[in-house]
């Protein structure tokens, strides 16, 4: 992606919500490489899908020759961003936040190149400049440049202040000042001139631009990404089980892959532009192919492969595809113990059982059947498989060979209703 038309290409992909000064940004990019940053607050022990668009934007800029700075908010994470939040965030301990900072830095690292010469990525932590700052310095050097009148009129704050049941503490109110100072420090240390981030960060971005101008007389620029939603208007990146995380221990690669496989037809080509590095021409060609094939679209599988490989690597992708194929075919011989652990984590419903249980009890405990009587009828009708093999004996007791790797037995009722028994 050439630097000269980078912004145009991002706009074509729908990745630009607004540019604070589009003409100035175009002129600056025409002059040569720029340093830019995106902040990631440690509000949990993992990033989630909502962080993926700005993270991939950093990668897109680096591929075009620019220098990305990934800022993890070790200090701002101790405060919490109040923007558009209905209630105040729970304050976490310093030890917890530091642990989350370390995890998030490790998650960010594979997406960027930290050893590629002049545009090598930088990992920064705003605790480095806030950790030893005293309150007098904060108020005199930073606070005096912010107008309370302007701050309370920002929509992100106004929504909270207008609620009778939930106000805003001074702690949260100071978040905007902290984030404003981040850019000033990054501008000083790394000559950062551009910030990218979610469109819900516009208020914070404009405050940072203003503070950097006041303190250093430097003109810096903001490039907010759009808020990603599904075609039906619902929030993107959520499932019935909650957020889709980038940490494989919180959302398994199989579950992650399935999330993308289940993308609606109305969203899939848009998401290919947001979350992959396929060219617009390739995406348009795929859309045309799907339209004329007379078959189920291929786009969801392309999207799932591309994004799962980006986040979990080739090994994670192959495991996800292997599990998917085995569940579809009913043959489990290719599954490894680690694959079964993914299924136990979040792939299919799971129940723990003591050895010695019979099949009818397993169907009831797993909620595949409501009662032993109904379980008996279902087994007799040849609708139950154990590890892919039909079982029609209602009096069947599990054998040692049914316990794969000594730990797992996969039950299926009909074609799609699974439960994994984890033996105690």
Curated annotation (Swiss-Prot):
The residues listed in the UniProt record as binding ATP, with positions renumbered to this chain, are 238
Protein EC: 6.1.1.1
Q: How does it assemble?
A: Homodimer.
Q: Where does L-tyrosine bind?
A: 37, 175, 179
InterPro entries for the chain = aa-tRNA-synth_I_CS, aa-tRNA-synth_Ic, Rossmann-like_a/b/a_fold, S4_RNA-bd, S4_RNA-bd_sf, SYY-like_C, Tyr-tRNA-ligase, Tyr-tRNA-ligase_bac-type
Q: Which CDD domains match?
A: S4, TyrRS_core
Alphabetically ordered keywords of this record: Acetylation, Aminoacyl-tRNA synthetase, ATP-binding, Cytoplasm, Ligase, Nucleotide-binding, Protein biosynthesis, RNA-binding
Protein name, entry field: Tyrosine--tRNA ligase
Of the GO CC terms on this record, one is: cytosol
Q: So what does this one do?
A: Catalyzes the attachment of tyrosine to tRNA(Tyr) in a two-step reaction: tyrosine is first activated by ATP to form Tyr-AMP and then transferred to the acceptor end of tRNA(Tyr).
Per its record, what are the GO molecular function terms?
A: ATP binding; RNA binding; tyrosine-tRNA ligase activity
| GO BP terms, alphabetized | tyrosyl-tRNA aminoacylation
Q: Ranges for the S4 RNA-binding domain?
A: 357-414
**Protein localization:** Cytoplasm
Q: Spell out the reaction equation it catalyses.
A: tRNA(Tyr) + L-tyrosine + ATP = L-tyrosyl-tRNA(Tyr) + AMP + diphosphate + H(+)
Kindly list the positions at which N6-acetyllysine occurs in this protein. Answer: 144
Q: What is its main location?
A: cytoplasm
Q: Which family does it belong to?
A: Belongs to the class-I aminoacyl-tRNA synthetase family. TyrS type 1 subfamily.
Instruction: Tell me the enzyme class.
Output: ligase
Specify one Pfam family: tRNA-synt_1b
Query: Which residue numbers does the motif 'HIGH' region cover?
Result: 42-51
